[in-house]
Amino acid sequence: MTKGILGKKVGMTQIFTESGEFIPVTVIEATPNVVLQVKTVETDGYAAVQVGFDDKREVLSNKPAKGHVAKANTAPKRFIREFKNIEGLEVGQEITVETFAAGDVVDVTGTSKGKGFQGVIKRHGQSRGPMAHGSRYHRRPGSMGPVAPNRVFKGKNLAGRMGGNRVTIQNLEVVQVVPEKNVILIKGNVPGAKKSLITIKSAVKAGK
């Protein structure tokens, strides 16, 4: 069965195993998520569980939002997301970090850090030209393509805004779960800046 939870990236640290192995980990704070709605094929056309994370002040919420969370007897939420292939949950039920255990393999989704306007070398990994004095080609994007179409094809790798994209890293290992602090430690790094929203769910390709 698929498991999922929403959390907030705290930062990175390091831990040591009993054998002395050094492991870099990312700390994810995941306060209890509340099930706001259970969607079914009969009523909504697809099956999913809608969960809310991070309480929001009521003064910042409109009446439809307040009415929606009232069914789950909880406060308005800043983030609302859906998970598919999750069964056995009811409206108002809480999802805690204890859903996961050390050794679980998960997929982690976040929004990558924004880098601003960048050139093709940093943005797309292209090679630069000779830096010699006689060269007139250093860090330019290069050819725009053949002459015949009289235009530049869509998708051409050019300079532009870099980062700020939805990124998923697959098959990361849960190193430790700390229920009393609502914290999950995940091996390696995960996308996003500190305090950004992180989605953790069971790995799709685990064991493949």
UniProtKB/Swiss-Prot annotation:
Stored PROSITE patterns: RIBOSOMAL_L3 (PS00474)
Q: Highest taxon of the source?
A: Bacteria
The UniProt entry's GO biological process terms, in alphabetical order, are: translation
Q: Which UniProt keywords apply?
A: Ribonucleoprotein, Ribosomal protein, RNA-binding, rRNA-binding
For region Disordered, the annotated ranges are 124-145
- Gene Ontology molecular function, alphabetical: rRNA binding; structural constituent of ribosome
GO cellular component terms attached to this protein's record: cytosolic large ribosomal subunit
**Classification via Pfam families:** Ribosomal_L3
Known partners and oligomeric status? Part of the 50S ribosomal subunit. Forms a cluster with proteins L14 and L19.
Physiological role: One of the primary rRNA binding proteins, it binds directly near the 3'-end of the 23S rRNA, where it nucleates assembly of the 50S subunit.
**Protein family:** Belongs to the universal ribosomal protein uL3 family.
Name of the molecule in the record: Large ribosomal subunit protein uL3
- Provide the species name: Streptococcus suis (strain 05ZYH33)
* Name of the gene: rplC
